[in-house]
Design a protein with these regions (language model features):
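Noncatalytic linker/hinge segments flanking ATPase motor cores
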Residues: 50-56, 119-123
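Catalytic strand-loop segment that frames the active site of acyl-thioester-processing enzymes
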Residues: 1-51
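Short loop/turn segments at connectors of secondary-structure elements within structured domains
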Residues: 51, 73, 107-109
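Residues that form or immediately flank small-molecule/cofactor binding pockets and catalytic motifs
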Residues: 14, 84, 107
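Hydrophobic beta-strand-centered segment that forms part of the acyl-chain substrate-binding groove
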Residues: 47, 56-102
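Generic structural detector for well-ordered beta-strands
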Residues: 13-15, 80, 131-133
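HotDog/MaoC-like acyl-thioester-processing domains
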Residues: 1-9, 90-135
């Protein structure tokens, strides 16, 4: 596994469906109805039910964890939520496409990986990055 600056990580595609949102709500104790109730989501101006921001963030971090082989090697992770992932109530759900690239090599044995997560061709996370221990 190369961790040189410029290395592109293998792309990751994750499909989120409504049942994933319900399971995540139970695990996170975030039962905000915008994540499961269409009527509520639309009443607050959303186009439909949306994925939890933290679920989207977790999905995006998988690209780094799978690349490095040890989720514990991620020593820092951050992002801002740029736009929602709308999850329709159908068999297809929402497809989140994740790409990442090593952008900096630090002297302490870590590298910075910039991450992009996109839904419907548009980024959903802003400034997403992970600092990863590689040695």
């Amino acid at each position: 596994m190369s961790h040189e600056v410029g290395t592109e990580l293998p792309a990751l595609s994750v499909r989120l469906k409504r049942d994933d949102l319900v399971r995540y709500a139970g695990a996170s104790l975030d039962f905000n109805p915008i994540h499961w109730n269409e009527k509520t989501a639309k009443e607050v101006g959303l186009p439909d039910v949306i994925a939890h921001g933290m679920l989207t963030m977790a999905v995006a971090s998988r690209i780094v964890a799978e690349w490095i082989g040890d989720p514990g090697a991620i020593v820092e992770y951050g992002c801002r939520f740029g736009r929602p992932v709308v999850v329709p109530n159908d068999e297809e759900g929402a497809l989140v496409e994740v790409t990442a690239k090593v952008t900096k090599d630090f002297e302490d044995g870590t590298v910075k990986v910039n991450i992009n997560a996109a839904f419907d061709g548009k980024s959903v996370l802003t400034g997403a990055f992970a600092r990863v221990r590689v040695s």
